[in-house]
């Protein structure tokens, strides 16, 4: 009798991450983690993303024993400085003016845990923004309202028009859930997207 694969949970309220995970065709549920996302003093952006991805996964795993839980977090940086979520039009406009013609690093961190063992990964994506006019910035912001997105640009939709180039080992990392790395990690927990059975 084949082993029953463990229940899979995505520790996220992001619809983009849910859409990405559904590409792997593994049944899962999504649960919003209750985690304080405040950076620690002097914490490097990459360390913050990794710490939060682990915290999100562990918070959900603590109340769902026997499940495999995926936590993720993404931090964008320019010149090593973090770029947060803008929260509104004016701040988003300022961000995009600052990013115009520049390179931005996106750290897409992930943690997969069963509550006992934890695997982590940080996939870096380098995005170079086009030189943007104020008219282009305003048109984009009115069309997309990307106020909940670090860097004010949603590469999974119209925000791709702001980009000059994107370099990464994983094309889904920029959207917030690196599926190539995730597939590898899930295999270590007995979940294989191709067979639906233990890897």
Curated annotation (Swiss-Prot):
It holds the Pfam family Maf. It catalyses: N(7)-methyl-GTP + H2O = N(7)-methyl-GMP + diphosphate + H(+). InterPro entries: ITPase-like_fam, Maf-like. One of its GO terms (molecular function) is nucleoside triphosphate diphosphatase activity. It is found in: Cytoplasm. GO terms for biological process: nucleotide metabolic process. Its EC number is 3.6.1.-. One of its GO terms (cellular component) is cytoplasm. Its cofactor is a divalent metal cation. Keywords: Cytoplasm, Hydrolase, Nucleotide metabolism. The record marks 16, 74, 156 as: Important for substrate specificity. The active site is at 73 (proton acceptor). Nucleoside triphosphate pyrophosphatase that hydrolyzes 7-methyl-GTP (m(7)GTP). May have a dual role in cell division arrest and in preventing the incorporation of modified nucleotides into cellular nucleic acids. Belongs to the Maf family. YceF subfamily. This is 7-methyl-GTP pyrophosphatase.
